[in-house]
UniProtKB/Swiss-Prot annotation:
PANTHER family from the UniProt entry: ATP-DEPENDENT 6-PHOSPHOFRUCTOKINASE (PTHR13697:SF4), PHOSPHOFRUCTOKINASE (PTHR13697)
Protein name per UniProt: ATP-dependent 6-phosphofructokinase
Any GO BP: fructose 6-phosphate metabolic process
This protein's encoding gene: pfkA
Described function: Catalyzes the phosphorylation of D-fructose 6-phosphate to fructose 1,6-bisphosphate by ATP, the first committing step of glycolysis.
Residues given in the record as ADP binding sites: 21-25, 155, 186-188, 212, 214-216
InterPro entries per record: ATP_PFK, ATP_PFK_prok-type, PFKA_ATP_prok, Phosphofructokinase_CS, Phosphofructokinase_dom, PKF_sf
Subcellular location: Cytoplasm
Family affiliation: Belongs to the phosphofructokinase type A (PFKA) family. ATP-dependent PFK group I subfamily. Prokaryotic clade 'B1' sub-subfamily.
Cofactors named for this entry: Mg(2+)
Catalytic activity, reaction form: beta-D-fructose 6-phosphate + ATP = beta-D-fructose 1,6-bisphosphate + ADP + H(+)
């Protein structure tokens, strides 16, 4: 193997740049030519390629986002689109592809291998942390720290005004961010897609906390469970006073990655190149315990990842 490519796809996650840097520098150290694909699968179809040298990735580890840029490509979801991408790969003599992204991106990588035998290795990067068979995805730790910092600031003003704040965080199908953020900030309630919410019980809990002298309430809701406005309507009707809503939105995706995310991304980037050199393809690099392992992409994607129900109960007891 002499020439490989790397792309970032789907929603950006802090640490993607660190993974790109590792792929490029480790690849170059092993005598490989490394090609960067701009704009994810859209760039793969269009042939938007750039050769990346050692110096091109200097100083990017600490940067959020992705220097390669990213996109969500509808064309790549078609067989015709993937055929165009495969033709570009073969035309440019690329012998292996590292795909950094979430569920959709990894599915695309698998299809490239299944349909066109393009050697691919996936690196899980998504702040939702909803990919199976890996304990952690790139970007999760940074996102959690961003949410934690925001909630702590909201608690200051919530206490000053004796108010209840409803904080909506990302997580369409997974409540991981909401659960962990709620646990570490001592939120009074955590609403996640995996567990049905009883608004009457929630209101009773908030009112009971008020009777015990607590002057603020923080409710963290994952976007996939309910909108913050829906939660507010249900609660205000039952508790009899106004709430305040904060939707953190895309601020959760940005920012300089934490030390934990940088280390994970750099390690996964190195392991991805090793997997290609070893001829072990159609695999995803996963963190299990404290060890990086290679698992089949579709096995990871077909393994449903759920939140820790015991941790959810602990968060409730400690709030």
């Amino acid at each position: 193997m002499k020439k490989i490519a790397v792309l970032t796809s789907g929603g950006d996650a802090p640490g993607m740049n660190a993974a790109v840097r590792a792929v490029v520098r480790y690849g170059v150290r092993h005598g490989l030519e490394v090609i960067g694909v701009r704009r994810g699968y859209s760039g793969l179809i269009d042939g938007d390629f750039v050769k990346l040298e050692y110096k091109d990735v200097a100083g990017i580890t600490e940067k959020g986002g992705t220097i390669l840029r990213t996109s969500r490509c509808e064309e790549f979801k078609t067989e015709e689109g993937r055929e165009l991408a495969a033709k570009q790969i073969k035309k440019h003599g690329i012998e292996g592809l590292v795909v950094i992204g979430g569920e959709g991106s990894l599915t695309g990588a698998h299809l490239l291998y299944e349909e066109h035998k393009i050697p691919v290795v996936g690196i899980p990067a998504t702040i939702d942390n909803d990919i199976g068979l890996t304990d952690m995805c790139i970007g999760v730790d940074t996102c959690l720290n961003t949410v934690m910092d925001a909630v702590q600031k909201l608690k200051d003003t919530a206490s000053s005004h004796e108010r209840a704040f409803i904080v909506e965080v990302m997580g369409r199908h997974s409540g991981y961010i909401a659960l962990m953020a709620g646990l570490v900030t001592g939120a009074e309630a955590i609403i996640v897609p995996e567990i049905p919410v009883d608004y009457s019980q929630l209101a009773d809990r908030i009112l009971e906390e008020r009777r015990r002298g607590k002057i603020n309430s923080i409710i963290i809701v994952a976007e996939g469970a309910a909108s913050a406005y829906t939660v507010a309507r249900h609660l205000e009707y039952r508790i009899g006073y106004e709430t305040r809503i904060t939707i953190l939105g895309h601020v959760q995706r940005g920012g300089s990655p934490t030390a934990s995310d940088r280390r994970l991304a750099l390690s996964m980037g190195v392991e991805a190149v090793d997997a290609l050199l070893d001829g072990e393809v159609d695999v995803m690099i996963a963190l299990q315990g404290n060890k990086l392992v290679r698992v089949p992409i579709m096995e990871a994607l077909s393994t449903k990842k759920t939140i820790d129900k015991k941790l959810y109960e602990i968060a409730y007891m400690l709030s």
